[in-house]
Amino acid sequence: MLLSACQNVKQTQLVLFDSLSFGMSPKSFEEVFGEASQVVEEEETAYRDTWRAEDPYFYKTGRLFYHYEQITLKGYTGRARFTFSKSHRLEEVTAHFPVTSKAEQQALLFNLFQTVKKELEALPDYQSMATDTVGLYDDGYRYKVKLEGKRKELWVDVYPTEDGSVGSQVDKYTIRVDQFLMYQ
């Protein structure tokens, strides 16, 4: 009875990923999205003697990270990381879209701003949206979406990144899109 009640809970759909939603299990996620390039289980450090921080050891937290190196979303090619909680439910998504120049980065950023905003407004449980600036130079946006019947807000960050230490022009400029649910 409890299992069927949990399955009937309306889940929040992801933006840019048509058939994915927060709260999915890894099994149902893999059925929709396919096999990952790499799956990593998070490890943390703890100390047997916490007072002196001596005798460290590693333990697995249970959180899973699914890495996809070659994905195509709405005509854009990039890579993505999906984070599953300790209870193995999808809780966060990060997508990176590399471009070759600053001008191409700005054009893609503008297109993603419009695409993400349209998709958010089209969500079935969309109620309202607030927008903040994010990024080093306030050149990105954080969309905070209130959803009907939910205590959590859907937050989507879209912002440019630039890695000056990278010699390759392909990996220097990227657009990053983060999605997660946040208690408000």
Show the residue positions of the predicted features.
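Short, recurring structural edge motifs at helix starts
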Residues: 13-19
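Structured segments of extracytoplasmic/periplasmic soluble domains
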Residues: 23, 32-39, 83, 115, ...
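C-terminal motif of bacterial Sec signal peptides marking the signal peptidase cleavage site
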Residues: 3-5
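Post-signal-peptide N-terminal segment of Sec-exported extracytoplasmic proteins
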Residues: 24-57
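An acidic-aromatic pocket/loop used at catalytic or ligand-binding sites
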Residues: 98-100, 141-184
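Long, charged/polar, surface-exposed segments that mediate recognition or autoinhibition
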Residues: 69-140
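Bacterial signal peptide processing site
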Residues: 7-9
